Amino acid sequence: MSRVKRGVTARARHKKVLNQAKGYYGARSRVYRVAKQAVIKAGQYAYRDRKVKKRTFRSLWIVRINAAARQHDISYSQLINGLNKADVELDRKALAELAVYNKDAFAAVVEKAKAALA
């Protein structure tokens, strides 16, 4: 069996990591050992923040819905309660879109919720 030197493989692996670390500051983009750590940490942050993004957007939608609902003299929790009682199955993302871009439709939804609460 012939001997296999690892030069080509190692260079390819190093190049892959250094390409992933492009744009990083200082040694993090130039030195393999440091770049590898930076890339691993970046991956951990990316994985975590894909989960956090969902929470962040949900809270943003709730803030927007609450602000729009209060303009119609109803709180967010009352609005959601009214929509549940009226069997309106609009999710928070859709409600927030209506609240921002289609105020007339949102007003109609609010009236439906108020009617269910009365």
UniProtKB/Swiss-Prot annotation:
It holds the Pfam family Ribosomal_L20. PROSITE patterns: RIBOSOMAL_L20 (PS00937). Keywords: Ribonucleoprotein, Ribosomal protein, RNA-binding, rRNA-binding. Belongs to the bacterial ribosomal protein bL20 family. Gene3D superfamilies: 6.10.160.10, Ribosomal protein L20. This is Large ribosomal subunit protein bL20. One of its GO terms (cellular component) is ribosome. The gene is rplT. Disulfide bonds: none annotated. One of its GO terms (molecular function) is structural constituent of ribosome. It comes from Francisella tularensis subsp. holarctica (strain LVS). GO terms for biological process: ribosomal large subunit assembly; translation. It comes from the Bacteria. Binds directly to 23S ribosomal RNA and is necessary for the in vitro assembly process of the 50S ribosomal subunit. It is not involved in the protein synthesizing functions of that subunit. InterPro entries: Ribosomal_bL20 (IPR005813), RIBOSOMAL_L20_CS (IPR049946), Ribosomal_protein_bL20_C (IPR035566).
